[in-house]
């Protein structure tokens, strides 16, 4: 395995251990998502070529975790979201490792913490009617894109043409609303059903879109499985979850598609940001 990828995975495991320490000590429900869940089930650890870890939390737990981090998070790390760092354009959180460097191309010019990270996605209750959910999700995506452009983030170079066109359109109206107004509108929309508690939950910041919809019962029902020598929580219904995301998830992709998701050439370990 490439030494940089191995070192990156080890750094992320350190961050994961810190997240788990805080969650377990404070009875915070969390779960492995996406490729991290797949890696745990298929490889009992990282997918060999994977370079990130994704964690999910119910919004209420996410907010509690965020508050606890102010006092209990080890000084080696930093909790980042659009509240803790004004230039942040993400609608989810990250735990970053201080004195390291890893940045995605679209955020390269943004003045913010750029340490090695783990993503933490808050799950919110959403409308049980899929048609209504889709309308509200599209509205959220529009606001998110407007917010990202407002913060100075660039569109990914490999984004679909439709996405690039939408970003171009958004740039034309980015001056109509302030960043704080956009944050308030997004938060109001994302947490719209959190008090009424529907039967469906969703992580608005995720990459898999509607495929990540999950029932309330399935979200809170987890089991612990092996992951790089530690036990991590995954959905008990992981077969249903992973099939939705990857279909035949136990069959690895062809060799030519086994690529790291990020450019690892500029990753720095134990360096000042």
Where does each model-flagged region fall?
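Conserved catalytic core of two-metal-ion nucleotidyltransferases
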Residues: 1-24, 69-128, 148-245, 252-273
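Active-site nucleotide-donor binding segment shared across nucleotidyl transfer reactions
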Residues: 20-53, 62-63, 217, 244-245
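Short active-site oxyanion
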Residues: 53-54, 230
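Short hydrophobic/aromatic beta-strand micro-patches
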Residues: 56-58
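Conserved SAM-binding loop
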Residues: 65-67
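A short secondary-structure junction signal
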Residues: 130-135
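Short, His- and charge-rich active-site/binding loops that engage polyanionic ligands
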Residues: 137-140
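Helical lid/core segments from catalytic subdomains that handle acyl or acyl-like groups
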Residues: 143
């Amino acid at each position: 395995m490439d030494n940089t990828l191995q070192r990156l995975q080890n750094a992320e495991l350190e961050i994961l251990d810190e997240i788990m320490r805080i969650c377990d000590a404070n009875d915070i429900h969390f779960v492995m998502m996406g490729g991290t869940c797949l890696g745990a089930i298929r490889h009992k650890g990282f997918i060999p070529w994977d370079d990130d870890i994704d964690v999910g939390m119910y919004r209420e737990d996410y907010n509690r975790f965020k508050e606890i981090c102010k006092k209990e998070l080890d000084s080696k790390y930093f909790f980042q979201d659009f509240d803790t760092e004004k230039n942040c354009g993400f609608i989810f959180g990250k735990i970053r490792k201080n004195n390291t460097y890893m940045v995605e191309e679209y955020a390269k010019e943004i003045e913010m913490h750029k340490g090695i990270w783990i993503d933490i996605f808050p799950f919110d209750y959403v409308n049980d009617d899929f048609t209504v959910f889709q309308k509200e999700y599209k509205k959220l995506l529009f606001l998110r894109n407007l917010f990202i452009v407002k913060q100075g983030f660039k569109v990914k170079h490999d984004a679909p043409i439709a996405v690039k066109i939408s970003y171009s359109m958004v740039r034309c109206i980015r001056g109509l609303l302030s960043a704080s107004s956009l944050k308030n509108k997004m938060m109001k929309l994302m947490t719209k059903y959190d008090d009424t508690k529907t039967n469906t939950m969703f992580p608005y910041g995720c990459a898999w879109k509607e495929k990540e919809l999950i029932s309330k019962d399935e979200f809170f029902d987890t089991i612990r499985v092996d992951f790089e020598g530690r036990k991590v929580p995954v959905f008990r219904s992981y077969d249903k979850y992973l099939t939705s995301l990857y279909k035949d998830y136990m069959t690895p992709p062809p060799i030519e598609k086994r690529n790291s998701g990020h450019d690892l050439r500029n990753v720095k370990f134990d360096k000042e940001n």
